[in-house]
Amino acid sequence: PTLHSARLAISGSGGIGIADSCGLQFVQEVFAEKNCAEKLNPGTDAVIELGGEDAKILFFGRHFDARMNDSCAGGTGAFIDQMASLLNVETPQMNELAQQAQNTYTIASRCGVFAKSDIQPLLNQGAEKSDLAASIFHAVASQAITGLAKGRPISGNVLYLGGPLTFMSCLCDAFDSVLNIKGVCPENSLLYVAMGAAFCAEHEVDLTTLPEKLQAAAAQHSFEHLPPLFKNEDEYTVFKKRHSKESVAIGTPEEASEAFIGIDSGSTTIKIAVMSPDGKLLDSFYQSNKGNPVVAVRNYLTDFYTKYPHCRLLAGAVTGYGEDLIRHGFGVDYGIVETMAHFYAAQYLEPEVDFILDIGGQDMKCLKIHNGAIDNIFLNEACSSGCGSFLQTFAEILGYTAEQFAQIGLKADMPVDLGSRCTVFMNSSVKQAQKDGASVANISAGLSISIVKNALYKVIRPASKEAIGKHIVVQGGTFLNDCVLRAFEQEMDLNVIRPNIAGLMGAYGAALYAQRRYKDAPHQTTLLNLQQLGEFVHTVKGMTCGLCNNHCHLTVNTFAGGKRFISGNRCERPITHMAPKDELNLYRQKLQLLKELPVNETPKRGIMGIPMGLNMYELLPFWNALLSSLGFKVVHSPIEDKTIYRLGQGTIPSDTVCYPAKLMHGHIKWLLQQGITNIFYPCMTYNIDEQGTENCYNCPVVAYYPEVLHANIRDLNKPEINFFYDYLGLLHKKKLVKKLQEMFAKAYPDITKDEIRKAVDAAFTAFYDYEAQVKAKGQEIISKAREEHKPIVVLAGRPYHIDPKVNHSIDRLITNMGAALVSEDAVSSHIKTKELNRDLQVLNQWTYHGRLYAAAEYVAQNPDMHLIQLVSFGCGCDAITADECRRLLEERGRIYTQIKIDDIDNLGAAKIRIRSLFSAAQLFDIDNN
């Protein structure tokens, strides 16, 4: 029988507008889901639900609590869809792949585009897709737990709801593994919100008239829009004509007997340029690498040799994310960092170029040129929402190729104002615009404008339009999109140069570089020939290195003849089987000093545990001496144990706090697991006064994180645990003695004031000895580097940035490139702080900040030194220090380099930044000499 009426209610993120327009009952989705779970699954303790763009955890019990994602759609169904697209598989295949996994990698899940920055280098290095699929599921589970549970334990009877958890058993397994539980995905798990809404429905609705009401509601919407990119067809014709003037001469391989080849193995695409000795582009290749750049390069070279046997390739160069893999696999003569490749190409086309903007698949490079040399480099730090993959993702979602999507956007009459949000969350804005009646053309144009705003206001951040330059070259595949190019010119109100080979400039620059190097030293090319390509073999195997405590996940690529390329290593040990040489690395020498601190082996008062993180990387010598003097044996948590983070993951209350702070939860958990009942980690508003700064504050996280740990790690509140987290200061000895006596009074009333006074004296002596050793070792490294004519890098950060878990061995990456390395505290004392304060544009009131400013000033005064600042994601304070350090360096004509770090240990982007700095500095020196 036909159903004419029913009790009906609507729920879900898109339901409230429909309910209002049609006069229907709306039930909030959390309430609907809670209602259904209580009716169908009594005794449920928690619900974890992943949807398309939302994620939620519901806690049942005496106090019901709901946690939902608010500003980021990372770690949801849309995130998994995007990762499947990146792996070039259908979403359902992700589960099949994950079932075959042998290893897992650390992948970011806070942002879909940022995750590409972790996955794409692994793909380019030959990592197995099955391992990556499993890693993505683990990342989603970690994101949900740390981002939503915020430290609240998840245990007991747990339901898994929503599409991703329903259709992907390996995702459920990942949650089970991280939470150490066995959750249940119930029958009708997709329908709990709908069934809950039905249980709540109170009013009968006439179903025969409902379709008309829904259609009427759909026609009422409108959307915010911007002016069109082109007013009419004539304006577009003039635009095309202007940009057709800037071009590289085009030839054919038939007309040349010799050529140079450049390969750009990018994040998502492979670009190849074959160039004649007089600069003509003879042949080119541009396509998606489909997660396997090796196959694409082999096919191209085989095809070229077969078609043009008369055209001899004299030399080749490779650049991009896959540079090392392609160079090893195909015997390419030279490698060049991609920033320099793009610079060579732009300078060849426009000798007076003073600014280059390259937007690729997931990275953005901005090069400031002065007097024919690179003066400064900007790269997108983490987010790729202003890049080509951003547009490509949406084109595919809407059912178009990137080229079709761009053409459609040219005809937009009302581009949607989408702002500049992150990729995964932009899904919501695009879907809302569609509901509001926006055409695909207006969405395409709106997204192009968003890309430009991201580039300008989140990466370049110019003080004015004039500051960018007068001779601007834009390149990269994204600028082949006329919508993006037009949006950039409109936003900046100036005309720019887009070469006819904008998408090939990296490859063309690599070919120019190969030609330059070949002219300097002619030789027989090492490129594989046609016969060798016919015998070409490439196998990939994942393994975990056991040669040190890093336990790096290695990807071993084996080629014909047994030649191997290993990636994923953070030192040379897997290749050389020798321990890294750290005599010119102050980071490692500081760690060694901390490891060699004396231990009280005859403690009269037992063991005192110290969590080895944050300010303990500076103050351990102080507290070790003090506590040892008081009769304790000091045991600190491990320095190089990568499992520490997961130990405390479930107790982290905020996903936005910096990674070094998150690690503290694991350090405390480790100490508790060892049965240690005394844990010492005091709150410290102030640091040691280093004289000259306006004050000597610690940052709020360093100062007060013990409070966060006490509030979120329940075991610290057990009666048998003594957690010493009182507020202490090192500015006044007498006050410190008094506070320590008060702190220990309850647990150790026998500790006398005289004992504490002697212990404090011993602590200050030990600390100043350690400080002197650091400065002396730093000076030794600087002197030796100058004797050996090595570049000197001041890797400037905070004390805890020497932690290998935090810096991911970036220090060794730098020294492996041939540089000497010191930390900011080794050089900061050379600067008179009071004089520096007069030049600063910020209040110098934080101890760590003061060292950074002084180090930047010292580097600016020493031409053989370069500063690289390490910044942890989530560090609000370093938003200030980064700008001020940049200013101090750039006003002296020096290059500022920043590397942002968190829990992700793939160093592909960091390597590009460091090589770019060294290459630019070398060019600058040559130019000035």
Descriptions of predicted regions:
Residues R62-N103, L190-V193, F199-H203, S284-V294, ...:
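Glycine-rich phosphate-binding loop plus the immediately following alpha-helix
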Residues N69, A73-I80, C383-L391, L398, ...:
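An N-terminal assembly and electron-transfer interface module characteristic of large anaerobic redox
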Residues P1-F31, L58-R67, P277, N289, ...:
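Short beta-strand-loop/turn "lid" adjacent to the catalytic site in phosphate-handling enzymes
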Residues G14, L148-V178, S189-V193, T319-G322, ...:
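Glycine-rich phosphate-binding loops at beta-strand->alpha-helix junctions
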Residues L132-G156, A197, K240-A249, G446-G469, ...:
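Phosphate/ATP-binding catalytic cores across multiple sugar-kinase/actin-like superfamilies
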Residues I80-Q82, E187-H221, Y344, G388-T393, ...:
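Glycine-rich phosphate-binding/hydrolytic loop that grips phosphoryl groups
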